[in-house]
């Protein structure tokens, strides 16, 4: 077969898309077309920040039906989403309650309990995963302690992409790359860790053994009656984004830039040394047995909240105003957990500047300048940490995802990090999703083969560092941990 048509459902924390890919195996050309886009936002339910999962499922099905109604024969479907959140099911496979978002405050104070009762080093030795207060391990502990009436009804717990695949196929699956984000998978066995799971109060019977990307979960029957395989890809959106990152060589780092920024490198081995623990480095699962050695950064979430609060719709105009302002007048640590979900992001940023005796950003452009400069400087700090961890410097940084369209931030990143930045592709998560589908269909050999396809079909933009820029001169002075606490607490 010359042409393949694959559908990727890519769900982010603020929006979702159903994308159609067309792959010409003879010429190795790959194109994407957006079929359906929809909003994903939090809602308050019984005092919790929850996801409107029924609305998301409705939009997923609508997008799939749109493809089928065009008369296109779909070869496969797959779903990727954000990590750590889950859906509870009873014995009949019906949902128990609504899925609570990782941004809900129910996990406040939970992680310190685990550090005392299990031990920080022991948790890291077992999982290799960074300490974030909203990891699934702490969410489940909060669930079992705060909502025992729900816990009593639970027979299964599915992570978000696995839940939607279940709704399409009727088959349950626990995909490995996303499972590792829970901080509950043992890094040596690739299975759920008995000690960590027991601490949460959740039953091991809620979970099946994690499966690696590339297996067919089951079939979705389209309105025309065709059975279409649903593939388990690297279902954590960052894992998919890394697959589509055209990394030039082992000296290339990546930055998946979106609501979250995730900076790291690929490795055939995990890094679980005391140094890695001290830096709060994570070793998330990737495709083909590779590890994604990385660190979470709050990312463009801060900007997204400011845009929403200030009702700003013309982002290019705001960026143009921001670029005209001097650099490094207002600096914050984007990874301070005060920015996870404040009532008023603008006020929180201003308070952080005020508390550190800095000028206070007032205009929208000043707020954006504060966010961009602070992110770029934090990127530089973390890239330095990662280079020290592996004992080799990086020569190139690949920025992928929606954030790579921000030319100002890309240049600030290049200047602050002091290395060449390659920006693109924008649709990295979707492309990585498609890549695993094409491998499952035996159209591609492996991840490296797919990256060649990406490089041949998608243009990258190069940013050369300017050592004389204001932000480059400021790098040595910037200490993101100086007066703030990290997400790891």
Swiss-Prot record:
Gene Ontology cellular component terms for the protein in this record: cytosol
CDD domains, per the entry: ASKHA_NBD_FGGY_RhaB-like
Superkingdom, natural source: Bacteria
Cysteines joined through disulfide linkages: 68-222, 353-370, 413-417
InterPro entries: ATPase_NBD, FGGY_C, FGGY_N, Rhamnulokinase
Residues involved in substrate binding: 83, 236-238, 296
Keyword Phosphoprotein: no
Annotated positions binding ATP: 13-17, 259, 304, 402
Cofactor(s) for this UniProt protein: Mg(2+)
EC number: 2.7.1.5
Pathway noted in the entry: Carbohydrate degradation; L-rhamnose degradation; glycerone phosphate from L-rhamnose: step 2/3
Function of the protein: Involved in the catabolism of L-rhamnose (6-deoxy-L-mannose). Catalyzes the transfer of the gamma-phosphate group from ATP to the 1-hydroxyl group of L-rhamnulose to yield L-rhamnulose 1-phosphate.
NCBIfam families in the cross-refs: PRK10640.1, rhamnulo_kin
Protein name per the record: Rhamnulokinase
Taxonomic source organism: Salmonella dublin (strain CT_02021853)
